[in-house]
């Protein structure tokens, strides 16, 4: 409390001085803002925070970035935390900080890739990043799922998990059971993919698990929720036009694509396949390359195979 009062008094005093004196005082003022703000910064983490580091992004407690990688990790940690608003400040000795912030903030593809590494419930629908010439960076996030959707989906996952998962079966066999259930109880939402009709929330797990309609985002989010409960390390992986699951089992990363295992047929009959179940990258690309061509500089776990 004492420190907060001192800080408020200091800022008020320096604000008055800045109105009277020169740019050097203004610089001193902003340096003080950075010092107090960065030292008082805390990031609240919700229950869906992933205590997991990946090769492309890692959690960080460093809110004073020194390079572009620090900034990327900070954005990952902010999104991963589930916090809706967060502010950090560029250090004065990091000359290119704002340019590096802008490079990520204006690159929706990069932000979407970062989003693939967080728990579905912490993923964003929209992210706004604002910055000032003084080095203040404000991040505001609208999540993909609201509280009501999370509660309904979580209840459904709990119900299905207790019914479908057998502790006496292997992890892979349990993943296959869940894979089959999601496909057998969902249809691919062609109205959304072909005509942009949004009758269903098929781009998120709500469509797949509650409404029985899904596109690739819905299939992959639904699968990710069960993988979390199984304790299987995972993330989503995306190309320019598609998204699917990456899973880590017995020391190996695999591709898992429920969308392509639930093909659309000309007579609208339901088909369950396992053609895209637990594949290596070479196996995946031997089957289909155009929609599964991904950036190996981002999804580095597959580059080392």
Predicted regions and their residues:
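Acidic, metal-dependent phosphodiester-chemistry machinery of nucleic-acid enzymes
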Residues: 63-64, 207-210
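Catalytic cysteine-centered active-site loop
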Residues: 193-198, 202, 206, 213-215, ...
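Hydrophobic/aromatic-rich core segments of domains that either
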Residues: 217-284
């Amino acid at each position: 409390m004492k420190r907060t009062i001192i800080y408020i008094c200091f800022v008020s005093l320096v604000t008055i001085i800045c109105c009277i004196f020169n740019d050097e005082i203004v610089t001193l003022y902003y340096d003080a803002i950075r010092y107090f703000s960065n030292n008082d910064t805390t990031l609240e983490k919700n229950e869906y925070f992933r205590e997991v580091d990946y090769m492309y992004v890692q959690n960080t407690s460093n809110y004073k970035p020194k390079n572009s990688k620090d900034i990327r990790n900070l954005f990952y940690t902010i999104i991963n935390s589930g916090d809706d608003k967060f502010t950090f400040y560029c250090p004065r000795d990091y000359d290119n900080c704002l340019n590096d912030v802008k490079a990520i903030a204006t690159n929706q593809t990069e932000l979407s890739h970062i989003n693939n590494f967080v728990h579905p419930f912490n993923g964003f629908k929209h992210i706004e990043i604002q910055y000032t010439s003084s080095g203040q960076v404000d991040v505001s996030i609208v999540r993909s799922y609201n509280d009501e959707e999370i509660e309904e989906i979580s209840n459904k996952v709990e119900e299905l998990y207790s019914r479908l998962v057998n502790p006496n079966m292997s992890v892979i066999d349990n993943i296959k059971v869940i894979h089959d259930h999601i496909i057998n109880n969902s249809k691919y939402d062609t109205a959304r993919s072909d005509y942009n009709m949004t009758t269903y929330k098929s781009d998120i797990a709500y469509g797949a698990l509650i409404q029985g309609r899904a596109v690739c985002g819905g299939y992959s989010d639904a699968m990710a929720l069960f993988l979390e409960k199984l304790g299987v390390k995972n993330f989503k992986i995306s190309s320019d036009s598609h998204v699917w699951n990456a899973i880590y089992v017995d020391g190996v990363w695999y591709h898992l694509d429920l969308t392509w295992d639930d093909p659309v047929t000309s007579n609208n009959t339901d088909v369950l396949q396992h053609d895209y179940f637990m594949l290596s990258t070479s196996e995946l690309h031997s089957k289909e390359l155009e929609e599964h061509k991904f950036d190996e500089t981002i999804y580095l776990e597959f580059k080392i195979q």
